[in-house]
C-alpha cells in the first residue's frame, strides 16, 4: 500500500510518500511546498492545491493520511491552517484518494511511542524507521510520520470497522477470534 502523508500549513505544507507491506516501510518521496507569503490567500491555497495534485499524480498513492487541526491560542492562525487543510483535502479528493485523518497525538504515539514527543524526536524516528541517510526537514518528517501512522494503524482500523458496525446492530458475534454472521 502506498501512502501519501500530508502536514498542512499555509506557509509550508509537508508531504511524504511511503510504501507499506506488512510491517516493512519503504521511503518513496518527501518534500515541502513553500508558499510565497506575498500572495493573496486564494492564490496561496491554489499553490498548495496544485502542488499536492502534482505530487499525487507523480507518486500514485493508494491512500492519503492527513493531520487533524485543533484550536490553538490564536483563533485566526487556526482558521488559516484550516484553509490550508481544505486545499489539501480538495487535492486529495480530486485525485480520487480515500483520506484518513489522525491527531498529532496519534501520529507521535504511533511513530515515536509517546504522544508528547518533540519535533526532533519525530525527525529522528522517521529517519530510523525509513532508513534515511539524513534527517528529514521538519515539515517533511511530520508528513512522513503521518504516513507511517496510517501504515501502523490503518489496516487495523479497516479490519475492525466491520466488527464495530455489526456489533452495534447485534447481528454478529465473535467466537474463537472469528467474526460470525
From Swiss-Prot:
Reactions the enzyme catalyzes: Endonucleolytic cleavage at a junction such as a reciprocal single-stranded crossover between two homologous DNA duplexes (Holliday junction)
Cofactor comment text: Binds 2 Mg(2+) ion per subunit.
Annotated active site: 7, 67, 139
GO biological process, one term: DNA repair
Molecular function, one GO term: crossover junction DNA endonuclease activity
GO CC terms: cytoplasm; Holliday junction resolvase complex
EC number of the protein: 3.1.21.10
Cofactors that this protein relies on: Mg(2+)
Pfam families assigned: RuvC
Residues that hold Mg(2+) 2 according to the record: 67
Keywords linked to the UniProt accession: Cytoplasm, DNA damage, DNA recombination, DNA repair, DNA-binding, Endonuclease, Hydrolase, Magnesium, Metal-binding, Nuclease
Family indicated by similarity: Belongs to the RuvC family.
Physiological role: The RuvA-RuvB-RuvC complex processes Holliday junction (HJ) DNA during genetic recombination and DNA repair. Endonuclease that resolves HJ intermediates. Cleaves cruciform DNA by making single-stranded nicks across the HJ at symmetrical positions within the homologous arms, yielding a 5'-phosphate and a 3'-hydroxyl group; requires a central core of homology in the junction. The consensus cleavage sequence is 5'-(A/T)TT(C/G)-3'. Cleavage occurs on the 3'-side of the TT dinucleotide at the point of strand exchange.
NCBIfam families, per the entry: ruvC (TIGR00228)
Protein's name according to its UniProt entry: Crossover junction endodeoxyribonuclease RuvC
Organism (species): Bordetella avium (strain 197N)
Classification of source organism: Bacteria, Pseudomonadati, Pseudomonadota, Betaproteobacteria, Burkholderiales
Amino acid at each position: 500500500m502506498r501512502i501519501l502523508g500530508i502536514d498542512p500549513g499555509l506557509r509550508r505544507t509537508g508531504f511524504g510518500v511511503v510504501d507499506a507491506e506488512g510491517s516493512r516501510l519503504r521511503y518513496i518521496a518527501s518534500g515541502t511546498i513553500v508558499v510565497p507569503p506575498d500572495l493573496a490567500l486564494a492564490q496561496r491555497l491554489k499553490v498548495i492545491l496544485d502542488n499536492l495534485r502534482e505530487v499525487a499524480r507523480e507518486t500514485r498513492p493508494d491512500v492519503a493520511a492527513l493531520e487533524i487541526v485543533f484550536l490553538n491560542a490564536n483563533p485566526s492562525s487556526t482558521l488559516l491552517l484550516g484553509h490550508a487543510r481544505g486545499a489539501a483535502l480538495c487535492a486529495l479528493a480530486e485525485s480520487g484518494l480515500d483520506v484518513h485523518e489522525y491527531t498529532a497525538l496519534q501520529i507521535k504515539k504511533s511513530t515515536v511511542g509517546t504522544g508528547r514527543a518533540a519535533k526532533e524526536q519525530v525527525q529522528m524516528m522517521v529517519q530510523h524507521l525509513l532508513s534515511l541517510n539524513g534527517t528529514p526537514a521538519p515539515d517533511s518528517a511530520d508528513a512522513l510520520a503521518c504516513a507511517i501512522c496510517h501504515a501502523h494503524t490503518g489496516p487495523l482500523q479497516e479490519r475492525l470497522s466491520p466488527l464495530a458496525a455489526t456489533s452495534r446492530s447485534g447481528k454478529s458475534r465473535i467466537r474463537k477470534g472469528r467474526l460470525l454472521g
